[in-house]
C-alpha cells in the first residue's frame, strides 16, 4: 500500500540514504521541505548539485576542496615539517577549529577494516608515502579515530613510516573535559593514564 504521493515517496527514499537518517527522520525532512517556499527548496537542491559538481580532491593532501591545491596546502605560513593524518575531511575541520595546529594534513578517506573489505589499497596511503620524500618533513601525527579500525590504521602507518626516518606520533586519547572518572570505560581510563603529562 502506497502511503505517499510518488514524488514524496521518492524524496523520502533518497533522504533515508543519508548517513544517520532513518525512515522517520527522512519523512520529517521531506514534509518540512514540502512546506518551505519553493525558492528555498530550489536553493537547497542547487547547493547539493553545485557542491557535488564543484568539489574535488586536493592533489597534495586529498582533502575536499574547490581549488587545487587546497587553501591549506597553498598556505606558505603553514608548517611543512608536520603532516597530521586523519580519516575523513570532517576531521580536518575538527582539528582546524582548535586553531592550534598549523601544519599540513593528509586525508585517508577511511580506515583499515578487513571485515568491510577496506585494505591499504582503498585508502590514500600511497599518496601519503609519496609525500614522505619531502626533506622538510620531520613528523607525521596520526590522528585516526580511537576505534579498532583507527588503531589498526595507526599501527599500520607507523610500521610503514618509521623505517623512513620520519618521527611518527599518535594523538593522545583520554577523558573528555567535564567527564567523570566513574563513567569512563577501562580503555579510555588506561589511555588517559598512559597519556598523562607533568604539571
UniProtKB/Swiss-Prot annotation:
Pfam families: RecR_C, RecR_HhH, RecR_ZnF, Toprim_4. One of its GO terms (molecular function) is zinc ion binding. The keyword Lyase does not apply. Residues 81-176 form the Toprim domain. It comes from the Bacteria. InterPro entries: DNA_Rcmb_RecR (IPR000093), Hlx-hairpin-Hlx_DNA-bd_motif (IPR003583), Rcmb_RecR (IPR023627), Rcmb_RecR_Znf (IPR015967), TOPRIM_dom (IPR006171), TOPRIM_RecR (IPR034137). One of its GO terms (biological process) is DNA recombination. Belongs to the RecR family. This is Recombination protein RecR.
Amino acid at each position: 500500500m502506497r502511503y505517499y504521493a510518488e514524488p514524496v515517496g521518492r524524496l523520502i527514499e533518497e533522504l533515508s540514504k543519508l548517513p544517520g537518517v532513518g525512515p522517520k527522520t527522512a519523512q520529517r525532512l521531506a514534509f518540512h521541505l514540502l512546506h518551505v517556499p519553493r525558492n528555498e527548496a530550489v536553493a537547497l537542491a542547487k547547493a547539493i548539485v553545485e557542491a557535488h559538481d564543484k568539489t574535488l580532491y586536493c592533489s597534495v593532501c586529498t582533502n575536499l576542496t574547490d581549488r587545487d591545491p587546497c587553501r591549506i596546502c597553498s598556505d606558505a605560513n603553514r608548517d611543512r615539517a608536520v603532516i597530521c593524518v586523519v580519516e575523513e575531511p570532517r576531521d580536518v575541520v575538527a582539528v582546524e577549529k582548535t586553531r592550534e595546529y598549523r601544519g599540513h594534513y593528509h586525508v585517508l578517506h577511511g580506515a583499515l577494516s578487513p571485515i568491510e573489505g577496506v585494505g591499504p589499497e582503498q585508502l590514500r596511503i600511497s599518496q601519503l608515502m609519496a609525500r614522505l620524500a619531502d626533506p622538510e618533513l620531520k613528523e607525521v601525527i596520526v590522528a585516526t579515530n580511537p576505534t579498532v579500525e583507527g588503531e589498526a590504521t595507526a599501527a599500520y602507518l607507523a610500521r610503514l613510516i618509521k623505517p623512513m626516518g620520519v618521527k611518527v606520533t599518535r594523538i593522545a586519547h583520554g577523558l573528555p573535559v567535564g567527564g567523570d572518572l566513574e563513567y569512563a570505560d577501562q580503555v579510555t581510563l588506561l589511555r588517559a593514564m598512559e597519556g598523562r603529562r607533568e604539571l
